[in-house]
Amino acid sequence: MTKKVYHQYWFWYLAAFVVFLLDQGSKHWIEAAFDYNETKVFTSFFNFTLRYNPGAAFSFLADAGGWQRWFFTIVAVAASVLLIVWICRVASSKPREAFALSFILGGAVGNLYDRIIHGHVVDFIVVHYQDYYWPAFNLADAAISLGAMVLIADLFINPDKTSGEKPTNA
């Protein structure tokens, strides 16, 4: 592995670490500044409300009895290892993909940390329209979503040139 490639994938790992730090810093701040379920309204469609989510996205399995903490921990660890390897493989050749993966990795590790340390994920960002409220989320969730959107957009912007080719027999 060349020195240039080595530095490129470490750049993306550093980006993931920055996402993790921003996520954890925001969660630390919200827990210090707010009581549970306390709301601060910023606009007619955006507010902060401190909430705890023992489940996954959209509180999936939040009331499952406790086993979900370790199940989602194992899933997050496996996904993080996969993302670390994937970033290493694409760091020098696909920077947009590496960017997306680093945001997903940083967000995944941020929520993983919460789940291991607190037994739940700290959520606080609430977006709504009139009486319809999107489930509360955090910066880690936003980073994961942004990374996923960039990956999907990249599929359309740069389709794999080999996807339409038939494999050749050697």
UniProtKB/Swiss-Prot annotation:
The active site is at D123, D141. Keywords: Aspartyl protease, Cell inner membrane, Cell membrane, Hydrolase, Membrane, Protease, Transmembrane, Transmembrane helix. It is found in: Cell inner membrane. The keyword Transmembrane applies. One of its GO terms (biological process) is proteolysis. Belongs to the peptidase A8 family. This is Lipoprotein signal peptidase. The gene is lspA.
